A protein has these predicted regions:
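Single conserved hydrophobic/aromatic residue that forms the stacking wall/gate
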Residues: 1-13
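Eukaryotic scaffold repeat domains enriched in small/polar residues
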Residues: 17-410
Length: 410
């Protein structure tokens, strides 16, 4: 349940929002945002939801066998550009494939040279409007490459006050970043997120042109012996066509922007009473309390927008990410169930299920692309989509055609 401080803020967020549920199938310009992701009655069920709840059809793209990609891991990163070329980060490299899945090239080399990357930190940042990619070069600087692999220069990640910037998105001529935290002293009263959740800089003059306020900055905890947070901290983000969605991992509002200057609250999570809140999560993060002190308490993890609703991951605070329950909540309806079992594939007989939104995926132009390990096609009840596919083959790219909004189909 929510603590009193966070609850007051949360209630203020919801005031005036619920009418959106009565208008959800109208044109976006006519709908009162944000949409409510209502999980207040969410139950955990062994019965999985269906891919057909949000997708109309499924197809498959065979990737070249060279270079060899190891068995799919959660560390993979997937991107598809406006020409449907495919980019897969595996280990220290980013591989480019054409729309048919044929390998083209690696976009940069690993090494000590001025145009090379020593060791990439995190995932690459793609700019779909200006067709380039940013790579965090060992935390020293960000290197920029065109999507053809041409080196375009670099810029430092540390400002004049020794603050480290971590860039996570790029839209038009602007970059979105957050400042990495300064390690607090034991006993210090702190909100590790700071007064702003993220910042936007202009690429033309390297100036900060927007700051997203942290409206829960007044909630603080006492630094204990350690810091503890998951690899997703502090932000979830999705770039879908011209829209960028951002949410702090401990907060309830998902913001949407098309220009990185105007951020609209697009979705708000309405929690179940068993869910934890920002105050408890911040206390756990800075070591003011331990996860074992909040057994049986749950958290909403990833939320991935789709045209007709959202995919979400949900789990006990003491559980592992890979063990998250997953579900789909249709716009205007309540999320009633989530399941530890993957979404059942009722669109064809090649694949039994898909572990969305936890598996590696990317959305563009009404399609959801998902990387799937080949052993999944050899489970009982499944069959490979290609006759020469083996369990040792490179992963297959699944292409789900997503259902459209009502206003787009009438």
């Amino acid at each position: 349940a929510l603590s009193s401080a966070a609850s007051d803020v949360y209630k203020r967020q919801l005031i005036g929002c619920t009418p959106a549920q009565k208008q959800v199938m109208q044109n976006d310009a006519e709908v009162q945002h944000p949409y409510i992701i209502d999980m207040s009655e969410l139950e955990i069920s062994e019965t999985p939801q269906m891919l057909s709840d949000f997708a109309d059809s499924i197809s498959y793209i065979r990737l070249s066998e060279e270079p060899l990609l190891p068995e799919i891991a959660l560390t993979f990163h997937l991107y598809v550009d406006k020409n449907e070329n495919i980019y897969i980060k595996e280990g220290s490299l980013v591989y480019k494939y054409n729309p048919k899945g044929e390998f083209i090239k690696s976009l940069f080399n690993v090494g000590q040279g001025p145009k090379e990357v020593i060791l990439p930190f995190g995932d690459p940042v793609y700019n779909s409007e200006q067709q380039f990619m940013l790579v965090n070069n060992y935390g020293v600087n960000f290197k920029q490459y065109s999507l053809e692999g041409t080196y375009m220069g670099d810029f430092r990640t540390i400002d004049s006050l020794d603050n480290h910037k971590r860039f996570i998105a790029s839209i038009e001529d602007k970059d979105v970043f957050y400042y990495e935290y300064h390690y607090p002293k034991r006993g210090e009263e702190i909100n590790l997120d700071g007064p702003y959740l993220w910042y936007v800089r202009s690429r033309s003059n390297d100036s900060i042109i927007y700051k997203m306020p942290n409206h829960l900055f007044h909630i603080k905890a006492t630094k204990g012996m350690y810091l503890a947070f998951g690899g997703e901290y502090p932000l979830y983000y999705n770039k879908i066509d011209s829209n960028l969605y951002m949410r702090h991992v401990y907060q309830d509002t998902i913001f949407r922007t098309t220009d990185a200057l105007k951020w609209e609250p697009w979705y708000v999570i309405k929690h179940h009473q068993r869910d934890t809140d920002y105050a408890n999560l911040m206390a756990i993060t800075v070591g003011d309390m331990a996860k074992r002190d909040v057994e049986g308490v749950y958290q909403v993890f990833e939320v991935s927008p789709l045209p007709t609703g959202v995919l979400f991951a949900y789990n006990d605070l003491n559980g592992w990410r890979k063990d998250c329950k997953t579900g789909f909540c249709k716009i205007g309806e309540k999320a009633l169930t989530c399941s530890p079992n993957s979404f059942k594939n009722d669109l064809d007989d090649c694949l039994k299920s898909i572990r969305l939104p936890l598996c590696c995926h990317f959305q563009r132009n009404g399609y959801l692309y998902v990387l799937i390990s080949t052993p999944d096609f050899f489970e009982e009840g499944a069959k490979p989509p290609f006759p020469d596919l083996t369990e040792d083959s490179n992963p297959v790219l699944v292409k789900l055609k997503l259902k459209k909004r009502w206003k787009e189909t009438n």
